[in-house]
């Protein structure tokens, strides 16, 4: 078995990769209709139950032999060794020499995980205790604003992982908001974002959560400063301490802003932003749903962590789904994956996954600094069903690109209404569409079948549904805090598996840094009194001069 010392080895030169290459050559032209005919029980047998999640991976262009070969690839790449190293707190983020400890954020009380010589579990639960005390005070009305009024709205100011996770989870769990506190979210440095979110708010009943680990993120501090001016204009300077709290580790900057450091909630270098919604970054979520529901959310994540850490690779959901991602990206040439939640409350889930997957695995060098030798990083995108059916499913069904899809649905709705004739459930209509789409994507409809229906010959080729389009279906009883946690962890660990096989560091993001530096350098040129010096390239120079002339 491979060890961490083998991280620099090129998996594309391995025996397992060559076997998959040869196997793909034999399988590529086979249709799912044929695969199901030869293996009629696969629809019942190629499923996994992980906590509340029922996962059907039978509609993939993969035979049982394919799955065996993919598992062999995972073993040769050292997936088990890397997984165990992560759970042991080792520094698997090699470019930054850091541990990767997001799994510690959802450890049950009393469980330990040593990171950098400290008990991460104990550290996490101390922060959770403080978060719980604070949100209890908010929700009960014990915490009052500067005028003595109760807080009714929390506004989370963050960006990237400090925004996408809380926004997504808040929307997904809106039915669990039960204390009269609503949440709004500001991320974009475009002033329209902040202005829109402040519209209609009463400063006396508004609390801001400024989420920035270093308390120096340009977009976040720009928005926070503007929000501070808005508050001070209404309530005065002394009100800041009662209307701002921070999620940060920089006590000096937090204090200078006017926030009492007793109301600063920290997290650690071993938590990446895109893996942080279950840390203090989730404070806005806890404020709306309460600490008990937040604990259920964490327990859902931990349930999938335990499955990932202990299940054999052959029956390990994140491993198999990550391997199928490799199968399509590297052997079929697929470039993207559609994520299609048949739940409007999960509307932001695809955007959340975009950061999780693309910031993690959008790398062109391996962990040892050498160039990758195969495509990396899936492009994730999607919209809720059934909206997408009337927008882009046409390309999924009849286009020339292979786009694997993940369908997510629930047995019981968070809201339901009767159908137009009053005899049925709108949720049943929604779910019938999910099942129909996965069936048609997989099996399609042949020219012979269409002609047999009496279709005009000239229309037959236009109506052919090729099928052979792969998908995973993930079902759960209902969209609960635990299930949201399970879904997040399921995808987190898929990303991990893919990154290990590609030999890349899935936990850094150096690609975002240069743009930040360039923006700071260019900002002064946009408003300078004198004409700026010419830029290195004529395009940027001309754009800056156009902007200056028209602002």
Swiss-Prot record:
Catalytic activity from the UniProt record: alpha-D-glucose 6-phosphate = beta-D-fructose 6-phosphate
Regions crossing the membrane: none
Function: Catalyzes the reversible isomerization of glucose-6-phosphate to fructose-6-phosphate.
Keyword Nucleotide-binding: no
GO CC aspect terms: cytosol
Family of this protein: Belongs to the GPI family.
Pathway: Carbohydrate biosynthesis; gluconeogenesis; Carbohydrate degradation; glycolysis; D-glyceraldehyde 3-phosphate and glycerone phosphate from D-glucose: step 2/4
Keywords: Cytoplasm, Gluconeogenesis, Glycolysis, Isomerase
Enzyme class: isomerase
Active site: 359 (proton donor), 390, 516
This protein's record includes keyword Protein biosynthesis: no
Subcellular localization, as worded in the UniProt entry: Cytoplasm
Coiled coil: none
Protein name: Glucose-6-phosphate isomerase
Database matches in SUPFAM superfamilies: SIS domain
InterPro entries for this protein: G6P_Isomerase, G6P_Isomerase_C, Phosphoglucose_isomerase_CS, SIS_dom_sf, SIS_PGI_1, SIS_PGI_2
GO BP of this protein: gluconeogenesis; glucose 6-phosphate metabolic process; glycolytic process
PANTHER family: GLUCOSE-6-PHOSPHATE ISOMERASE
Enzyme Commission numbers on file: 5.3.1.9
GO molecular function, one term: glucose-6-phosphate isomerase activity
